[in-house]
Design a protein with these regions (language model features):
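Membrane-interface extramembranous regions
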Residues: 2-139
Length: 139
């Protein structure tokens, strides 16, 4: 049961939950990916194309978010950094630049990865700013 001293902000909760999700996705991706960079459209985790470098990036994002979730200021900072980075990756993916496919196995504008990066980046920025005003009891 949470006490007043263990209350988390929504930004901390977001960072913790999405950090764990990104860690799990990063680990799971190693079971389906066959190449370090590039890759086949058949190397998918559910509907998301992955490769080993992509999985390492997911592990890093997860670790940064979890580390940031420890404090309110850390969560705001990590949510901002991850949000800006993911929106940038989404933009590059939507532009269909070849290096995104060659390096991270992120395909053109119809790729589920681009939409996921856009949504996650927007949520992270929301929780780095306006969405971090109230506190929630720790679970």
């Amino acid at each position: 049961m949470a006490t007043a001293g263990t209350a988390r902000t929504p930004g901390q909760t977001f960072a913790l939950v999405f950090g764990v999700i990104y860690l799990l996705v990063g680990v799971a991706g190693f079971f389906v990916a066959t190449e370090f960079t590039g890759g086949s459209v058949d190397d998918k985790l559910i509907v998301f194309p992955v490769n080993h470098l992509h999985n390492i990036v997911h592990l890093a994002i997860g670790g940064l978010l979890i580390a940031g979730a420890r404090t309110t200021a850390g969560a705001k900072q990590m949510n901002m950094i991850v949000g800006v980075a993911l929106l940038g990756v989404a933009l590059l993916g939507f532009l269909g630049l070849d290096f995104m496919q060659d390096l991270l196995n992120i395909h053109g504008s119809g790729s589920a990865d681009n939409w996921l990066h856009l949504a996650t980046g927007a949520l992270a920025l929301y929780f780095a700013t306006a969405g971090d005003k109230a506190t929630t009891a720790g679970v």
